[in-house]
């Protein structure tokens, strides 16, 4: 069983478009984690009935905890397959989501990272953070990656 996890805090209609498109074009089990969004965003999460499983945090706990909540949900089911994470803002193209799923299936045990094409001006804080984490990641693993902060990731559960 393959999963798409989308952590969401204060999402807009881009999330609805993404969920509907992925549901229509794939057999991925979609999990959306509402990470403590305001009450007015409930109308967005209500649109996922029959399309996705919605897990809810009462208060914002951050993207990392939202991912852990979804991982725990999958672990409770005891199923094996691929897990893909994508951002709720619609920045990841659907074919890129499917591409990283395929790569994770072809390379079990590997971490597949989508890489963003940076164009234009990147905020100094973001550029510094990505540069620092790329350096630390390479020091720790010996593997060079171009974008450690990408929200598009895939790996297998086994």
Positions of the model-derived regions?
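Conserved short acidic donor-positioning loop in nucleotide-sugar-dependent glycosyltransferases
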Residues: 10, 35-39, 61, 70
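Short beta-strand-to-loop acidic/aromatic patch adjacent to the donor-nucleotide binding site
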Residues: 80-91
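Short, acidic, metal-binding catalytic loop of nucleotide-sugar glycosyltransferases
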Residues: 20-29
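Conserved donor nucleotide-binding strand/loop of the catalytic core
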Residues: 45-77
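A conserved hydrophobic helix/loop-capping motif in glycosyltransferases and polysaccharide synthases
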Residues: 2-11, 18
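A conserved acidic beta->alpha catalytic loop
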Residues: 34-42, 90-91
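Acceptor/aglycone-binding surface of glycosyltransferases and processive sugar-polymer synthases
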Residues: 59, 65-73, 94-158
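Acidic helix N-cap motif at the loop->helix transition within catalytic regions
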Residues: 14-17, 38-47
């Amino acid at each position: 069983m393959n999963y798409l996890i989308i952590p969401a805090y204060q999402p807009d209609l881009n999330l609805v478009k993404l969920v509907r498109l992925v549901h229509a074009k794939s057999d991925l089990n979609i999990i959306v984690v509402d990470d403590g969004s305001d009450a007015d965003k409930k109308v967005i999460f209500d649109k996922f009935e029959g399309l996705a499983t919605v897990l809810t945090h009462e208060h914002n706990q951050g993207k990392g905890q939202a991912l852990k909540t979804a991982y725990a949900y999958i672990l409770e089911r005891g199923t094996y397959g691929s897990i893909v994470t994508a951002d709720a803002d619609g920045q990841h193209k659907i074919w890129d989501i499917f591409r990283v799923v395929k790569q994770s299936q072809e390379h079990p045990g590997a971490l597949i990272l989508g890489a963003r094409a940076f164009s234009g001006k990147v905020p100094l804080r973001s550029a510094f953070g990505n540069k620092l984490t790329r350096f630390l990641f390479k020091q720790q693993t010996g593997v060079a990656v171009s974008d450690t902060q990408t929200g598009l990731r895939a790996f297998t559960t086994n």
